[in-house]
């Protein structure tokens, strides 16, 4: 599987948030960006991961970092997910999976013992110059947010 490497310039993007407002990577680079890709809103692993990142929101802020989740869901799905789970992370819509492809976070993965094409749970730490500082691929949701925080 092809992966992005630490030291590379992070691929730029422009995606809509839960309110339908377009946000680019450049818009976020006033802080470090923790960009995490997840398969689907309101599913067990994705909910756990989003809640964990939200619970650590103030700790990420102390480290001058903003947390941004990306999935193929639409704005309405993100709004519902944010509301139901009291999330305080930014969620972006990558409905055509173009950004996931740029970050090598879309491809073959195992699901219930079978190979499927889908989002590969991945997280990237991007510095204020837009350079990848850390790349995590095929992560487990449980405990991941804490691991990312400790990597900052």
UniProtKB/Swiss-Prot annotation:
Q: Is Oxidoreductase tagged as a keyword?
A: yes
Query: One Pfam family name from the record?
Result: AhpC-TSA
Classification via Gene3D superfamilies:
Glutaredoxin (3.40.30.10)
Highest taxon in the source lineage:
Bacteria
**One GO cellular component term noted in the UniProt record for this chain:** cytoplasm
Q: Which UniProt keywords apply?
A: Antioxidant, Disulfide bond, Oxidoreductase, Peroxidase, Redox-active center
Q: Which reaction does it catalyse?
A: a hydroperoxide + [thioredoxin]-dithiol = an alcohol + [thioredoxin]-disulfide + H2O
Q: Where is the Thioredoxin domain?
A: 4-152
Annotated disulfide bonds: 46-85
Where are the active-site residues found? 46
Q: Which GO terms of type biological process are on file?
A: cell redox homeostasis; cellular response to oxidative stress
Q: What is its EC number?
A: 1.11.1.24
InterPro entries, per database record: AhpC/TSA (IPR000866), Peroxiredoxin_AhpC-typ (IPR024706), Peroxiredoxin_BCP/PrxQ (IPR050924), Thioredoxin-like_sf (IPR036249), Thioredoxin_domain (IPR013766)
Instruction: List, alphabetically, the PROSITE patterns matched.
Output: THIOREDOXIN_2
Q: What is a GO molecular function of this protein?
A: thioredoxin peroxidase activity
Describe the protein's quaternary organization and the partners it interacts with.
Answer: Monomer.
Sequence similarity:
Belongs to the peroxiredoxin family. BCP/PrxQ subfamily.
- Additional remark text: The active site is a conserved redox-active cysteine residue, the peroxidatic cysteine (C(P)), which makes the nucleophilic attack on the peroxide substrate. The peroxide oxidizes the C(P)-SH to cysteine sulfenic acid (C(P)-SOH), which then reacts with another cysteine residue, the resolving cysteine (C(R)), to form a disulfide bridge. The disulfide is subsequently reduced by an appropriate electron donor to complete the catalytic cycle. In this atypical 2-Cys peroxiredoxin, C(R) is present in the same subunit to form an intramolecular disulfide.
Known function: Thiol-specific peroxidase that catalyzes the reduction of hydrogen peroxide and organic hydroperoxides to water and alcohols, respectively. Plays a role in cell protection against oxidative stress by detoxifying peroxides and as sensor of hydrogen peroxide-mediated signaling events.
Name the chain's protein.
Putative peroxiredoxin bcp
Native organism: Helicobacter pylori (strain J99 / ATCC 700824) (Campylobacter pylori J99)
* Encoding gene, per UniProt annotation: bcp
